[in-house]
Regions:
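Short, glycine/serine-rich, charged loops/turns that create anion-binding
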Residues: 12, 20, 66
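A conserved beta-turn-beta hairpin within the catalytic core of GNAT-like acetyltransferases
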Residues: 22-25
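Unchanged
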Residues: 34-57, 68-127
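Residue-level recognition of beta-strand microenvironments
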Residues: 61-64
Length: 154
């Protein structure tokens, strides 16, 4: 379970590029797991700063998404991950320039970029990004779990 932010400005979504896990090479939303004794808001602020370099100016909860993700581990074994995401609408603090992405052991992203919503497609976006696009367009999130298969094809 993790907390993630949807940040849209001028028709573009702020996304990160994943370097490990089932979404390797894909765009994903900034966010991640809470640390012990960390509130949801504290976690999303920390994750945004670590992964994008931006401080968040405003927050409002949107809802949750529920995914089952099939993928192939580096040892070629298949795995099923149950991913529960708590989503927040976020706005970056435009009064402060973005810092560089924080590098640390376990960092799972390599860059943060603003991508036009029209350019984010299934082929290079995580399920969270796809749900974010649907939410921006419709104002609603699905109530049922979705299943995605990223297993390596023989």
């Amino acid at each position: 379970m993790g907390v993630y932010g949807i940040c849209v400005s001028n028709g573009q979504l702020l996304v990160i590029r994943k370097t490990i896990g089932p979404y390797t090479g894909k765009y994903d939303l900034p966010g991640g797991r809470m640390e012990p004794r960390e509130s949801l808001e504290t976690a999303i602020r920390r994750e945004f700063l670590e992964e994008t370099g931006y401080n968040i100016q405003a927050l409002s909860p949107i809802g949750t998404c529920d995914f089952l993700v099939k993928w192939t581990l580096s040892n070629h074994e298949d795995e099923l991950v149950h991913h529960i995401a708590i989503l927040y609408k976020t706005v970056v603090d435009t009064g402060k320039p973005a810092n560089s992405i924080i590098s640390f052991e376990g960092q799972d992203s390599c860059e943060a970029v603003w991508v036009p919503l029209t350019e984010l497609t299934t082929g290079h976006s995580s399920p969270l990004v796809l749900q974010a696009i649907d939410w921006v367009r419709s104002g609603t999130l699905p109530v049922k779990a979705s299943c995605f298969d990223y297993r390596a094809q023989p």
